[in-house]
Every structure is written in structure tokens, then in C-alpha cells.
Regions:
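Bacterial N-terminal signal peptides that target proteins for export
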Residues: 1-8
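Repetitive helical segments and hydrophobic/amphipathic motifs
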Residues: 11-14
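Sec/Tat signal peptide C-region and signal peptidase I cleavage site
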Residues: 16-23
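N-terminal mature ectodomain segment of secretory-pathway/periplasmic proteins
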Residues: 28-118
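Gly/Pro-enriched, hydrophobic low-complexity segments
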Residues: 33, 99, 112-114, 124-125, ...
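Short amphipathic beta-strand and strand-loop transition segments with alternating hydrophobic
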Residues: 67-75, 156-162, 219-221
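Phosphate/NTP-binding elements of NTP-utilizing enzymes
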Residues: 121
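Short, solvent-exposed mixed-charge patches
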Residues: 270-271
Length: 271
């Protein structure tokens, strides 16, 4: 979930006073908006994504991708962002391409996805029938990585404290879906100074019966003025399965072209 952090250029007393009032009356909605939805990830970026899947017995499966991402949130139209993953490892899957277009809330459109299989030299559409489906076979579901506006769910500020020089907020979120995948999520946010340095660092997911299902921990890296995942780990408390995502070799605002995010480019190969 990526959007923009807008810095307010203000030196007048009314704006300073507004900041003081905000500091005294932080709401759960403010925390979610400023520390999550407004997180700036660049206008586009490319990186290496390493995904390690580990079962309860300790067996591991490793996948390495080249990742290309572009933000369309500020443009006209329904598209929110586009992403392409090209497999580098394992070698027997090298060149396999995956493309995903996500749409803005309120557009009424589900994500579009395509998979290119070099062995068959064919592209096929990949539909998401169930939001509980696992993204890249990991412990993150498609629901987990989808964009949700603040007003789509109910939020409650459970705790606010200072720890290690940072302001820590704990927010409980209850999805408002008719058939929610989770009864609630409890997220920890850490703010180091102002809102431009505030990120989500832990999420607890509770199943529809209120039992803890999985825990996600997140560390972040700042590249230029953009925030991206560094290492993210998800542990399923019921199955013992876990997933680790590592993002490296990041380049921000490199001017990725729209034509990169097309079926033709996916089939031709992205270099």
C-alpha cells in the first residue's frame, strides 16, 4: 500500500498552532493516514525482491525477482499502481514474468494480473477469486496488500507512548467487509520526530473467531526521500509457515516508461 507523504510548507503562526493542536489530539484515523496511506515510495522504483518461504519443518524455498513499480495515484483514470516481477531464481523459472495492475478504491475494479511463462512463450491472465489467496505463495494474502482507505474500516487508538525516543501508536482496526477475512488487526506505528518519519512496524492478524492467526513485522529503508520495505517477515501461528521479504538494490524515480507495464514488454523480456 503506497501513496504520498505531503510536506506542509508553512511558517505562519496559524499553521504552527494547527500542528500543536494536532499533536495534542492524535486520532487513530490520523495515525493510519499519515503513517501508512501517505507513505511516499517514489513516483517509480526498481529493486531486487527476495522471498523466502519456510514451512513448519524448516524447509525453505527461495525466489528472487527483479521488481519494477510505478505510481499512478495522482493521474486521471482508475489505475493506482502497476508492478512487474521478473524471476531470476530459481534458474529453471528464470524469465518468468508477473504483472499486476491495482486500481483506486471506488473504481469498482478488481486487480488485473498476467503471467508470462517463457517455456510456453505464452501470457495468461491470472484472476484473484478470493482475497484470502496467497500472494506469491506467501503468508500475505491479496487482501493484506490491497489499498484500503481510512473510512473503509473502523479504527481505535489503543495506546500511545514514548519508547526509545520514538512515539509509538497502537491502533486496532476492524474491517467493515460483509464477510471479513479478519475480525481485527492490531498495528504498531513508530514516529521518529514528525509525520514524515512514521511507519508501521508490526501487524497482528486475528481470524474471524478472534484468535491470533499471524504476525507481520516490518523494517524500512529510506532511499532519497522515499520509504520502502527493507525486511518484512510474516509468521503464521496456526500452520508454523513463515515468509520473509527482502528488498535491495533500490533505485528511486528512474523514469520507468508506461510501455514497460504491458503484455508486450512482459513477453519480450525486461532488461
Amino acid at each position: 500500500m503506497r501513496a504520498f507523504k505531503y510536506s506542509v510548507m508553512a511558517a505562519t503562526l496559524p499553521f504552527v498552532w494547527a500542528d500543536v493542536v494536532e499533536a495534542e489530539s492524535v486520532t487513530a484515523e490520523t495515525v493510519v493516514q499519515r503513517c501508512d496511506l501517505d507513505t511516499y515510495a517514489g513516483d517509480d522504483n526498481r529493486s531486487k525482491l527476495t522471498v523466502i518461504l519456510r514451512d513448519a519443518a524448516g524447509n525453505e524455498k527461495k525466489n528472487v525477482y527483479r521488481r519494477y513499480w510505478k505510481n499512478y495515484a495522482r493521474e486521471k483514470g482508475d489505475v493506482f499502481d502497476k508492478m512487474v516481477l521478473v524471476t531470476e531464481f530459481p534458474l529453471d523459472a528464470k524469465g518468468t514474468g508477473f504483472m499486476r495492475w491495482a486500481y483506486k478504491p471506488g473504481s469498482g475494479r478488481n486487480v488485473d494480473q498476467w503471467l508470462y511463462l517463457p517455456s510456453l512463450k505464452k501470457i495468461r491472465r491470472v484472476s484473484v477469486r478470493d482475497p484470502a489467496d496467497r500472494f506469491l505463495g506467501s503468508d500475505l494474502s491479496y487482501w493484506d496488500i490491497s489499498l484500503r482507505l481510512v473510512e473503509q474500516d473502523e479504527h481505535r487508538l489503543v495506546e500511545e507512548k514514548t519508547q526509545n525516543g520514538k512515539t509509538v501508536y497502537v491502533v486496532e482496526t476492524r474491517p467493515s467487509d460483509k464477510r471479513p477475512l479478519y475480525s481485527k488487526l492490531v498495528a504498531r506505528y513508530e514516529k521518529n520526530g514528525d509525520w514524515s518519519d512514521c511507519n508501521k512496524t508490526r501487524i497482528e492478524y486475528f481470524d474471524p473467531n478472534g484468535v491470533l492467526l499471524k504476525v507481520q513485522t516490518l523494517s524500512w529503508q529510506k532511499v532519497s526521500n522515499a520509504w520502502l520495505w527493507d525486511v518484512v517477515e510474516v509468521n503464521n501461528r496456526k500452520t508454523g509457515h513463515s515468509s520473509v521479504f527482502r528488498v535491495s538494490d533500490v533505485a528511486i524515480n528512474v523514469g520507468l516508461k508506461d510501455r514497460l507495464f504491458t503484455e508486450r514488454a512482459l513477453k519480450k523480456g525486461i532488461r
